[in-house]
From Swiss-Prot:
Residues annotated as binding 4-CDP-2-C-methyl-D-erythritol 2-phosphate: 8-10, 34-35, 56-58, 61-65, 100-106, 132-135, 139, 142
This protein's encoding gene: ispF
Protein's recorded name: 2-C-methyl-D-erythritol 2,4-cyclodiphosphate synthase
Classification via InterPro entries: MECDP_synthase, MECDP_synthase_CS, MECDP_synthase_sf
Cofactor binding mode and count: Binds 1 divalent metal cation per subunit.
Subunit text: Homotrimer.
Length: 159
């Protein structure tokens, strides 16, 4: 078994909506990013890549490459997952924590879990997503951006 950890953060800027966990969420602000700014899928992709010792999302999909400008993070996750499976790994489970004062994430979490399970070809019971605030402390608490942490457990499927 191998464990990976991922973290991502994006500042608010411009106009919304935002995309979090593959879900389009109405919000007056957008997120500043080279791709679609999906902190959940970026952190999750990093956690999975880390567990497989395949580097990180920036190595695989560099923000200096125009090909990834505005990229759909679900596509990036699926490509990373293909590479991980090619190394002989299967998914144990993933656990994601969104850190944001606003917008409210709870109504969108069930759909995030559906999308992640679809993209990883796993059961929804293998995907947990939760959200918290920082009680108005720090940059997320001041509403300056959104952060996310993710943990992934991989199991060696083949020798």
């Amino acid at each position: 078994m191998r464990i990976g950890h991922g973290f991502d953060v994006h500042a608010f800027g411009g106009e919304g909506p935002i995309i979090i966990g593959g879900v389009r969420i109405p919000y007056e602000k957008g997120l500043l990013a080279h791709s679609d700014g999906d902190v959940v899928l970026h952190a999750l992709t990093d956690a999975l890549l880390g567990a497989a010792a395949l580097g990180d999302i920036g190595k695989l999909f560099p923000d200096t490459d125009p090909a990834f400008k505005g990229a759909d993070s679900r596509e990036l996750l699926r490509e990373a997952w293909r590479r991980i499976q090619a190394k002989g790994y299967a998914l144990g489970n993933v656990d994601v924590t969104i850190i944001a004062q606003a917008p409210r994430m709870l109504p969108h979490i069930p759909q995030m879990r559906v999308f992640i399970a679809e993209d990883l070809g796993c059961h929804m019971d293998d995907v947990n997503v939760k959200a918290t605030t920082t009680e108005k402390l720090g940059f997320t608490g001041r509403g300056e951006g959104i952060a996310c942490e993710a943990v992934a457990l991989l199991i060696k499927a083949t020798k």
